[in-house]
Amino acid sequence: IAEPWDMGENGYQLGRFGGRWTEWNDRFRDGARALWHPDHRRGALQRFADLFLGSAQSFERPLQSVNFLTAHDGFTLSDLVSFDHKHNGANGEQNRDGHNHNLSHNHGAEGPTTDPLITAERERTVRALLLTLLLAQGVPMLSMGDERGHSQSGNNNAYCQDGPLSWLDWTASGNQASELEAFVRQTLTLLRRLPVLRQSRHLHTREQVSWWRVDDGVEMEAADWENPDLDALSVMLSSHQDIPGPSVTIALNIGEHDRPLRLPGECHWTLALGSAEGGTVAVLPRLSILLFQSLD
């Protein structure tokens, strides 16, 4: 596994290792974060489409792309939705160290809060980010502790910390951590059960993948992709002779309002999983991803 960037001229080498190499895909990281950030989501669906299907623009095969949201460097997932700015004072470098372009969003308060509305919005975004990662083609990498809300108090460069700031507290408990772990476990169970979500070759033909408008269930055209305000769509991944099992449709709404939903094709669909409550075969909640599987 390569971390395909380094200092200096020609240091960035994403997609150039080839062969049996897999590579951390930072374009996926930034594209996924932008989807759910209020200041960066305009045009984000168009930019993310290739990344969601395994980054064919960068890799010969989708399994060469190691998709991730967070890593050993940078914010934890909990901190990504809780801090607008890095807080690295404990590192002794006057907060000059660490990455500045984090695409993080605190949802209205910097750091921990007791505001139930802010907490609910953060949890909503965390679940949407996790489904963005786990439902994408490629190899998902989940940072240890993100599945239970691990925080480093806004420190995004904790390599020099060996104490409570960076340690994982495996004894910690609470409804929020337990519910998040259960959500991740449920998603991984579905991944194992639905081969169409784990494909080894890129999807190029309409028989494999198709994109649809959510409001009327009509297949997307060039004008839809050229709309800079596009904030919702669905993608159908079809099973076939080499990929048995149910087909799936993944519906995304990165906008601030619920949308009517009409699912594509002649299939009968059932909701398998959603990042937000209130999703049905006819309703796509705001800021959410829904996963449907075919019953045919």
Report residues per predicted region:
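Conserved alpha/beta catalytic core and glycan-binding cleft of carbohydrate-active enzymes
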Residues: 1-144, 148-149, 157-161, 250
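Carbohydrate-interacting/catalytic domains
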Residues: 15, 113, 118-123, 127, ...
